[in-house]
């Protein structure tokens, strides 16, 4: 068994890689740029998490959502005895917490840091990272770079120019599950990774079943019947408005279906608590706006309703 597979088993509990993970990881470890386009559930996160633990220094991961960062940090910490191995740097932290994170990084305790793009643009963040030993840069949900993408974030377009100040020769891995050829070209151009290797696998998901139903006058009753026919199975229901989220979640609970709401109008502590309960199977259904879901790693979700 090679060193990578030993690390894989020790830190993630897997005996073998799947899909394109191994060549992607080897390419990154060898100091080459990578652009990774894999479907949801294709194992993108491991492509930077394992190299972060394998290489010297700290890996910087740019991630667009606080919920997504927290989910990934919790998963990495869950497989390691030392919680300081992974941290987040975003607006959810107090000044004292930020100083603790920086101390762990400076003392070499931390191997991977998830940073919000808005936090990255701050002068103090740039100054601190310029003095840190960085192994590589990972850009998760890289489609946020593109003005043509459905999740465009202006701060994502500044990542490359910021790292030109911090570490101009940094190795970059950009990852997405959703990018048209036009968006792919824009990502590559913006990050200046024209000489990198592109990894793309099939997006055919034979294990998924899609169904479109006409809405009846009894939509809520239909929902309750469907969920009850999938008793004790995890599911996500997406609504267009916060009001719909709250009303539907309340209705499900009245009908003895363990449900929690999630939307940007809720206090952050409540959002985090509801997400944790869903991930820990303390509720069956999360009712949410599109604020929830990008990158959430829950292997037993059995239905998604829009």
Residues covered by each model-derived region:
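Helicase motor core with emphasis on the C-terminal RecA-like subdomain
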Residues: 6-11, 15-19, 23-35, 39-45, ...
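Conserved Rossmann-like nucleotide-cofactor binding loop
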Residues: 67
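Accessory DNA-binding and partner-docking regions appended to nucleic-acid-acting proteins
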Residues: 1-4
């Amino acid at each position: 068994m090679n060193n990578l597979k030993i690390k894989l088993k020790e830190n993630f509990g897997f005996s073998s890689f799947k899909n394109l993970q191994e060549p992607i990881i080897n390419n990154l470890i060898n100091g080459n740029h990578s652009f990774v386009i894999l479907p949801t559930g294709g194992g993108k996160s491991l492509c930077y998490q394992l190299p972060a633990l394998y290489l010297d220094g700290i890996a910087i991961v740019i991630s667009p959502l606080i919920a997504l960062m927290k989910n990934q940090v919790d998963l990495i910490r869950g497989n390691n005895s030392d919680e300081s191995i992974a941290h987040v740097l975003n607006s959810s932290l107090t000044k004292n917490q930020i100083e603790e994170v920086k101390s762990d990084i400076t003392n070499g305790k931390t191997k991977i840091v998830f940073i919000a793009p808005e936090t990255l643009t701050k002068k103090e963040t740039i100054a601190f990272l310029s003095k840190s030993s960085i192994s590589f840069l990972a850009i998760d949900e890289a489609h946020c770079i593109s003005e043509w993408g459905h999740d465009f974030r202006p701060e994502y377009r500044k990542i490359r120019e910021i790292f030109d100040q911090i570490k101009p020769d940094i190795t970059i891995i950009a990852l997405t599950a959703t990018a048209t050829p036009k968006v792919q070209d824009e990502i590559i151009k913006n990050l200046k990774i024209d000489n990198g290797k592109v990894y793309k696998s099939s997006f055919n998901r034979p294990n998924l079943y899609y169904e479109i139903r006409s809405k009846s006058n009894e939509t809520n009753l239909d929902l309750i019947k469907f969920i009850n026919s999938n008793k004790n199975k995890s599911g996500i229901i997406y609504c267009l408005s916060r009001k719909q989220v709250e009303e539907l979640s309340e209705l499900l609970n009245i009908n003895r279906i363990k449900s929690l709401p999630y939307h940007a109008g809720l206090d952050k502590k409540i959002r985090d608590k509801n997400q944790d309960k869903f991930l820990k199977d303390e509720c069956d259904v999360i009712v949410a706006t599109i604020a929830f879901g990008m990158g959430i790693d829950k292997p037993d979700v059995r239905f998604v309703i829009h």
